[in-house]
Amino acid sequence: MGDERMKKRNGFTLIELLAVIIVLAIIALIAMPIIFNVIENAKIKAMENSTYGVIDAVRMQYMEELLNDEDGTLTLEGDVDELTLSGEHPNGGTWEIVNAADVTTGRGIKVTDVTFASMAGYKCNNDLTTGKVTCAK
């Protein structure tokens, strides 16, 4: 009679359920840092793209002033509201034209310590040799 009750068992024991929960917790502990790293890298790439947008906007404003027969001096005085930007607007940093001959490629425009509200503590800079923008803490 005792053997019949053991054969009709349809559920899981508490130990089996705890084992599954422990395995899932271990998988979650391994996966969480990877997921957070992917999210952080995506935000950094978005900041870099927004910085490229600042460079393009400065380039376009500079070219527009040249076409309007102005002296080629672009003075923004830290205010980006004059620029038509794609992406997030920066809330700090400097951008200057250091080589007018390379403005058309964007490599004549130096950006230094550009910051964005979405990623506090990060600053973006560009390398005039390669034209690449990097953002870091």
Where are these regions (language model features)?
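Periplasmic/extracellular, small/polar-rich flexible segments of pilin-like filament-forming proteins
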Residues: 60-137
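Short, Lys/Arg-enriched N-terminal segments with co-localized hydrophobic residues
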Residues: 1-5
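Sec-dependent signal peptide cleavage junction
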Residues: 32-47
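N-terminal single-pass transmembrane signal-anchor helix
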Residues: 8-35
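Membrane-proximal N-terminal amphipathic helix
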Residues: 43-69
